[in-house]
Amino acid sequence: MSPGASRGPRGSQAPLIAPLCCAAAALGMLLWSPACQAFNLDVEKLTVYSGPKGSYFGYAVDFHIPDARTASVLVGAPKANTSQPDIVEGGAVYYCPWPAEGSAQCRQIPFDTTNNRKIRVNGTKEPIEFKSNQWFGATVKAHKGKVVACAPLYHWRTLKPTPEKDPVGTCYVAIQNFSAYAEFSPCRNSNADPEGQGYCQAGFSLDFYKNGDLIVGGPGSFYWQGQVITASVADIIANYSFKDILRKLAGEKQTEVAPASYDDSYLGYSVAAGEFTGDSQQELVAGIPRGAQNFGYVSIINSTDMTFIQNFTGEQMASYFGYTVVVSDVNSDGLDDVLVGAPLFMEREFESNPREVGQIYLYLQVSSLLFRDPQILTGTETFGRFGSAMAHLGDLNQDGYNDIAIGVPFAGKDQRGKVLIYNGNKDGLNTKPSQVLQGVWASHAVPSGFGFTLRGDSDIDKNDYPDLIVGAFGTGKVAVYRARPVVTVDAQLLLHPMIINLENKTCQVPDSMTSAACFSLRVCASVTGQSIANTIVLMAEVQLDSLKQKGAIKRTLFLDNHQAHRVFPLVIKRQKSHQCQDFIVYLRDETEFRDKLSPINISLNYSLDESTFKEGLEVKPILNYYRENIVSEQAHILVDCGEDNLCVPDLKLSARPDKHQVIIGDENHLMLIINARNEGEGAYEAELFVMIPEEADYVGIERNNKGFRPLSCEYKMENVTRMVVCDLGNPMVSGTNYSLGLRFAVPRLEKTNMSINFDLQIRSSNKDNPDSNFVSLQINITAVAQVEIRGVSHPPQIVLPIHNWEPEEEPHKEEEVGPLVEHIYELHNIGPSTISDTILEVGWPFSARDEFLLYIFHIQTLGPLQCQPNPNINPQDIKPAASPEDTPELSAFLRNSTIPHLVRKRDVHVVEFHRQSPAKILNCTNIECLQISCAVGRLEGGESAVLKVRSRLWAHTFLQRKNDPYALASLVSFEVKKMPYTDQPAKLPEGSIVIKTSVIWATPNVSFSIPLWVIILAILLGLLVLAILTLALWKCGFFDRARPPQEDMTDREQLTNDKTPEA
């Protein structure tokens, strides 16, 4: 039966295809992130082994060090092909020699070279076992000279009348340098089925007791309750028979079947061994990731009678608590501790968006079967599967505590995985990894599976530091990370004297005629470490006055080179306690620096001089990660502050603004009037700090007031804080009293609350009582807007009747209605503040007694103005004329020309363009008005919104009432509803204006028509008069031409002849 076969009568099917197949399916969830700081696993001199493509080479790994002279790496490749006849991807285990020099290649270990065994059924030979796709090499474990490898998907054909093919699993044991092999298949029997051991998958997990006995996990037995099986390797070898396929070992031990409530628990998913009862007999630890109602738990099992002693239960359902288990004495108290992985743990920071990050639980043993509450380490990367693999490393950095490697194989955006190294301490594990390994060498395949398999606690290169193997089965590679020797440095800085008197100038400055105060500086160091060289060279770097910022004046310099920085080698012999080097340091002249109070910090930074290391296979030493490589010491300048050399100032500060209110939109020039004084001892490097609010800008210091001190002030910015800093003296001596004025502009007030704050304080470099009281000035912000409305009628009056024009009683075109009348209204915000929500309403003289007065054709807006649609605009659906261009008068109005129609705020000011008495005023009190309602948007100071109403005087209405003068009045009003600020003014602007159009009558005129014959007669008479006049002028000789006298011509010719050229 295949793994997906239907379940028996005791519950639902829960197939288990090992983390092997699950891992292959989960490869789409890999993560990777950059490495953090590196500690002592070497990432440069890696030894990388490669296997056949697609073989999952690296799925399982282990060290094989049978004796002091031999070392190798064992690598499982569960999908590899072998030389076994007719077997496809049966899997293999590779032997990879160490060191991997020259052309040395990994080779398959011949655990099994045979085909499937067969039996005769009804005269035909049929296979009784199935080794293709059995995943041999999915687990590999070595103990001294013994090596065990398992195939958890090995299938067995039962001997029932109806045969079934069950994944019972099998293992092979190799001893004596792979010269002898034996098979161990504890779940293979003649009556295998899901209810029994048919789905056992023996070898799913694997470990050894310290005495060499074998521990095998079979999580599929008994309807996937799972079981754990132990046996002696010696018994397996001694009782093995290739032909007796169902032979049972006499000393074999197995956990028994449990009640049905334990189905689908997966006992044996992971196994380990440790001592927890206080005797010399190790116990068995087994992971059960789906037990306890899917919360998962780990059990400690008695190795003698296979009874359950104690459980650790998971905290979250489906977290797969127990996926991995590791036993290690992390805190080095002589008692074994238990680590449990739950790689599917979900972090529920927000219930709506949980993150699968994984967790590790460390149970520290206090005494026999008594453990502390677990220390929990939580992964940081979603779907990283933190805790999918764990490895006991031993004491990686030789600090006396064992360390742990944790695999995060599905980590990072590039899906390359990583391995985190956690160092142990007396309380458990450090909460942050000391090193993060990333699979750059395995980057050509995605996912690479880097970190899915780990193995440590073996020193393959014999340098007294344990090493680590990391498998990346997705890319078919395995890497050996070797631990680097750790060098611990004890460094010291010695200064003499530590208090420097500037007056005691005992050192002659080279290349100068000046003397200076000075002191001696001694740099000393010693080294310790396991397996380090006898001579260690440190590159030492000394920084003088190191707390001064970059670019600041260093108060001290080395006497021999006038520099504040020095790098030099420090050669240390391992046998000697300390080795030292001496220097002389001098102080600059006190006129060159201000700071006399802060300590002169001398810092020493050191590193290993890697140029002294030999090139070769050996890894280079590294400095201890947990020891700071920076040492500092401080010297002090002697100041005149009494016997204790300690100045205690008493700084006082007061301030007030010259105005207590600023207006939004205005320029808002503001001055802060400040008083600073010192009523104590000298304040060194005393400075006034004024924190500038984001709404304000610094203008400068007030210099026109003789009562103010003209201090030196400058604008500075630290991070995002803007400030003005004024120098008050160095020192600001006792009794100092300064007054000064600082000017600011406050232009940016639109997006702030209704006040701004200026924070002020005096600060000095004194150690005790260095600062003054803190002063905070609050200045209120208000909004003020002056709003006006103005308007015009064009034309201001209409004269009736219109010459040669008569209105139509039922007009169809606009021109047939009457004269054009336009009213234009402008809402203008003088400012300075902004208005954001205003209602503008117009009462329009529309009709009286069902007769139209001013008939509207069109409403036009300019600016942030939107009017509501009105059905009474052109209700007769008269065809409108093309809208004419604005007249010069209207254009001038739109350019904000001075118009006599002007109202501000609440005033109502009516101005008549023309008065003719007596004229009857038609307004909204005695006629029917059309209401036009408009919403005005945001108007900054100086901006306007314009409304233009185009209408026609309904001439028919007025021609029926000849000689009666009228004044048609429209009323426009506004009300500001809101300003765009958090707090609104107590009173918002409003106002109105009346615009009139006069209708007057012309004086009657009498018209005369001239007959045509009169016109013709007048023309003929005109022509006759012209002819008589012309004749008279001709008779008088007016048209005769006047000729010049003859003698004049003779004289002219004579003059011409006289002009003969000379010979």
Curated annotation (Swiss-Prot):
Main subcellular localization, coarse class? membrane
Keywords linked to the UniProt accession: Calcium, Cell adhesion, Cell membrane, Cleavage on pair of basic residues, Developmental protein, Differentiation, Disease variant, Disulfide bond, Glycoprotein, Integrin, Membrane, Metal-binding, Neurogenesis, Receptor, Repeat, Signal, Transmembrane, Transmembrane helix
User: Under the cellular component aspect of Gene Ontology, which terms does the record hold?
Assistant: apical part of cell; cell surface; dendritic spine membrane; endoplasmic reticulum; external side of plasma membrane; focal adhesion; glutamatergic synapse; integrin alpha8-beta1 complex
Question: Which chain regions cross the lipid bilayer?
Answer: 1013-1033
Q: Which residues bind Ca(2+) 4?
A: D459, D461, N463, Y465, D467
Location within or outside the cell: Membrane; Cell membrane
Which Pfam families does UniProt cross-reference here? Answer: FG-GAP, Integrin_A_Ig_1, Integrin_A_Ig_2, Integrin_A_Ig_3, Integrin_alpha
- GO biological process per UniProt: cell adhesion mediated by integrin; cell projection organization; cell-cell adhesion; cell-matrix adhesion; establishment of protein localization; extracellular matrix organization; inner ear morphogenesis; integrin-mediated signaling pathway
Changing T255M: what effect?
In RHDA1; uncertain significance
Per the UniProt entry, the glycosylated residues are 81, 122, 177, 239, 302, 311, 504, 601, 605, 719, 737, 753, 780, 896, 923, 1005
Question: Ranges in the Cytoplasmic compartment?
Answer: 1034-1063
Keyword Amino-acid biosynthesis belongs to the record: no
The intrachain disulfides are: C96-C106, C150-C171, C187-C200, C507-C518, C524-C580, C641-C647, C713-C726, C867-C924, C929-C934
Q: Which sites bind Ca(2+) 3?
A: D395, N397, D399, Y401, D403
Tissue distribution: Expressed in mesenchymal cells, including alveolar myofibroblasts, kidney mesangial cells and hepatic stellar cells and vascular and visceral smooth muscle (at protein level).
Q: Which GO terms describe its molecular function?
A: integrin binding; metal ion binding
> What are the boundaries of the signal sequence?
1-38
What does the record note on quaternary structure? Heterodimer of an alpha and a beta subunit. The alpha subunit is composed of a heavy and a light chain linked by a disulfide bond. Alpha-8 associates with beta-1.
| Pathological association | Renal hypodysplasia/aplasia 1: A perinatally lethal renal disease encompassing a spectrum of kidney development defects, including renal agenesis, bilateral renal aplasia, hypoplasia, (cystic) dysplasia, and severe obstructive uropathy.
- Outline what the protein does: Integrin alpha-8/beta-1 functions in the genesis of kidney and probably of other organs by regulating the recruitment of mesenchymal cells into epithelial structures. It recognizes the sequence R-G-D in a wide array of ligands including TNC, FN1, SPP1 TGFB1, TGFB3 and VTN. NPNT is probably its functional ligand in kidney genesis. Neuronal receptor for TNC it mediates cell-cell interactions and regulates neurite outgrowth of sensory and motor neurons.
The similarity comment for this entry is: Belongs to the integrin alpha chain family.
In Swiss-Prot or TrEMBL terms, this protein is called: Integrin alpha-8
Tell me the classification of the organism that encodes this protein. Answer: Eukaryota, Metazoa, Chordata, Craniata, Vertebrata
Give the encoding gene's name: ITGA8
